[in-house]
Swiss-Prot record:
EC number(s) from the headed UniProt entry: 4.2.1.59
CC terms in the record's Gene Ontology section: cytoplasm; membrane
This protein's UniProt keywords: Cytoplasm, Lipid A biosynthesis, Lipid biosynthesis, Lipid metabolism, Lyase
NCBIfam families: fabZ (TIGR01750), PRK00006.1 (NF000582)
Stated name of the protein: 3-hydroxyacyl-[acyl-carrier-protein] dehydratase FabZ
One Pfam family named in its UniProt record: FabA
Similarity annotation: Belongs to the thioester dehydratase family. FabZ subfamily.
Taxon lineage: Bacteria, Pseudomonadati, Pseudomonadota, Betaproteobacteria, Burkholderiales
Main location: cytoplasm
List of catalytic residues: 52
Signal peptide: none
Gene: fabZ
GO biological-process terms attached to the record: fatty acid biosynthetic process; lipid A biosynthetic process
MF-aspect GO terms: (3R)-hydroxyacyl-[acyl-carrier-protein] dehydratase activity
Function (record text): Involved in unsaturated fatty acids biosynthesis. Catalyzes the dehydration of short chain beta-hydroxyacyl-ACPs and long chain saturated and unsaturated beta-hydroxyacyl-ACPs.
Length: 149
């Protein structure tokens, strides 16, 4: 599935997240276990804008990191983009997180994630999110896969 678009219906089959915590609307590009580019349409209807901040709503940095982590989770799937029964992807670490641009309601947040390595059950990714081609956030992320109990 090289450079393939994947819509929300397929994302819902792959990720266990649901509203209000599903933060990937579309996969724009995908090379299995190599790289992924995803999209989040940031709307004023997101529940976190009620308190962050009512007079000047901005997307919380931790939510941008979560959107990157969900994108990274999608990247761990093979070329068939099938979820293994009972598999859950856990965010286990973050290094070098930097926030460089404020993300506002109405923005389109593009997440770009590449696999750095996979060793002893731990995936390591290089990730960055952009708005209008300007980097809003960058980080190295780590995740692992476990069977649901």
């Amino acid at each position: 599935m090289s450079a393939a678009e994947i819509d929300i219906r397929k994302i819902l089959k792959l990720l266990p997240h649901r509203y209000p915590f599903l933060l990937v609307d579309r996969v724009l590009e995908f090379e299995a276990q190599k790289r992924i580019k995803t999209l989040k349409n940031v709307t004023i209807n997101e529940p976190y804008f009620q308190g962050h901040f009512p007079e000047q709503p901005v997307m919380p940095g931790v939510m941008i990191l979560e959107a990157l982590a969900q994108s990274a989770g999608l990247l761990t799937f093979g070329a068939d983009m099938e979820r293994k029964e009972g598999a859950l992807y856990y965010f286990v670490g973050i290094d070098g997180a930097r926030f460089k641009q404020v993300v506002y309601p109405g923005d389109q947040l593009h997440m770009n994630v590449t696999v750095e390595r996979y060793i002893r059950g731990i995936w390591k990714f290089k990730a960055f999110a952009t708005v209008d081609d300007k980097v809003a956030c960058e980080a190295e992320l780590m995740c692992t896969v476990k069977q649901a109990e």
